[in-house]
C-alpha cells in the first residue's frame, strides 16, 4: 500500500511539473512573437535618394558607385546625359580648334543615387557635400567637389515620372519645331510658284525686250479728263477754267493799279 501511494504521488508530481512547463511555454510564446515583431519593425528599411548636382567630365555611374559604396549599400544609379545640341556644339568647337575627339564623347549633367537605407543617404549627403571627389593624388576628380543633396520623401517612381514628363515635353517641342519648319517651307514654295507664274505672264525681266507693268496713281490731267467725260462735265470744266482766268486777271489788275483785292478790302476795316 505504501508503494502504491508513493507511485500515485510521483505521478501527480510529474503531471504538475508537465502542466507548469506548458504554462511557462505559453507565457514565453507571446514574448517571442513580440520580439520577432519588433525585430521585423527594426529590419524594415526605407531607401533614400541623393541628388548629384555636378558631374565632372568622364565621370560615369560606375565611378560614383565605387566611391559611395564605401559608406553604404548603393542601389540604382541614373545619370542625365547632356543635350544633343550641346554635344554637337562641343564637337564643332573641338574640330574648329584642331583638337582630337575625346575618348569619352558622352558627358552627363546631373545624377541620382539610391541608397538602401535613407539614414545612410542623409549621412552621406551631409558629410560629403563640398568635399573633394577623389582622395588619391592621381585621381582625375581630385579637384572636383561633391554637390550632394538628400531628397526628402523622394522615391524612384517620382524620378521615373519626372523623366517621362521631360521626354514628353521634348517630343512636343520637336513636333512644334518640325511643324514650324514645314510651314516656312510651304510658304517659300508658294512664293516661288507665284513668282514663276508672274514671270510667265509678264515676261522675264532679265530679257531686253521684256517689260514690267504696274498700276500707278492717275495724274491731275487724267482726273480732269475723267470728270470732263462724265455727263455735264464739260460745262463744269469750262466754268472752272473761266473762274481760274478771272482770278488770275483780277490779281494782275491789282498789281498794275495798286488797288487791293476785293477779298482783302473786305477783310480790312
From Swiss-Prot:
- Disulfide pairings: none
Q: Which GO terms describe its cellular component?
A: nucleolus; transcription regulator complex
Tree of life domain: Eukaryota
Q: Where is the RRM domain?
A: 48-145
Query: What does the entry give for GO biological process?
Result: regulation of transcription by RNA polymerase II; spinal cord motor neuron differentiation
Against InterPro entries, the record matches this protein to: ABT1/Esf2, ABT1/ESF2_RRM, Nucleotide-bd_a/b_plait_sf, RBD_domain_sf
Which sequence ranges form a coiled-coil region, renumbered to this chain? 5-29, 164-194
Key words of the record: Coiled coil, DNA-binding, Nucleus, RNA-binding, Transcription, Transcription regulation
Q: What does this protein do?
A: Could be a novel TATA-binding protein (TBP) which can function as a basal transcription activator. Can act as a regulator of basal transcription for class II genes.
Q: Which family does it belong to?
A: Belongs to the ESF2/ABP1 family.
Species whose genome carries this gene? Mus musculus
Q: Give the protein's recorded name.
A: Activator of basal transcription 1
Chain intervals with Acidic residues compositional bias: 16-32
Amino acid at each position: 500500500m505504501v508503494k502504491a501511494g508513493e507511485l500515485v504521488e510521483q505521478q501527480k508530481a510529474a503531471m504538475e511539473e508537465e502542466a507548469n512547463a506548458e504554462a511557462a511555454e505559453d507565457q514565453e510564446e507571446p514574448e517571442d512573437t513580440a520580439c520577432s515583431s519588433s525585430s521585423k519593425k527594426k529590419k524594415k528599411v526605407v531607401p533614400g535618394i541623393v541628388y548629384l548636382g555636378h558631374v565632372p567630365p568622364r565621370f560615369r555611374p560606375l565611378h560614383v558607385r565605387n566611391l559611395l559604396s564605401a559608406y553604404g549599400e548603393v542601389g540604382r544609379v541614373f545619370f542625365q546625359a547632356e543635350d544633343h545640341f550641346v554635344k554637337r556644339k562641343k564637337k564643332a568647337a573641338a574640330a574648329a580648334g584642331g583638337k582630337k575627339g575625346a575618348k569619352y564623347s558622352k558627358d552627363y549633367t546631373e545624377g541620382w543615387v539610391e541608397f538602401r537605407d535613407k539614414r545612410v543617404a542623409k549621412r552621406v549627403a551631409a558629410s560629403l557635400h563640398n568635399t573633394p571627389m577623389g582622395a588619391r593624388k592621381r585621381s582625375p576628380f581630385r579637384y572636383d567637389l561633391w554637390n550632394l543633396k538628400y531628397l526628402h520623401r523622394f522615391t524612384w517612381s517620382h524620378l521615373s515620372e519626372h523623366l517621362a514628363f521631360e521626354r514628353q515635353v521634348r517630343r512636343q517641342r520637336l513636333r512644334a519645331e518640325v511643324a514650324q519648319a514645314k510651314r516656312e517651307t510651304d510658304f517659300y514654295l508658294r512664293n516661288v510658284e507665284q513668282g514663276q507664274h508672274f514671270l510667265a505672264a509678264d515676261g522675264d525681266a532679265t530679257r531686253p525686250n521684256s517689260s514690267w507693268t504696274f498700276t500707278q496713281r492717275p495724274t491731275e490731267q487724267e482726273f480732269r479728263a475723267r470728270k470732263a467725260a462724265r455727263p455735264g462735265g464739260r460745262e463744269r470744266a469750262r466754268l472752272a477754267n473761266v473762274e481760274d482766268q478771272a482770278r488770275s486777271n483780277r490779281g494782275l489788275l491789282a498789281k498794275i493799279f495798286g488797288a487791293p483785292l476785293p477779298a482783302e478790302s473786305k477783310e480790312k476795316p
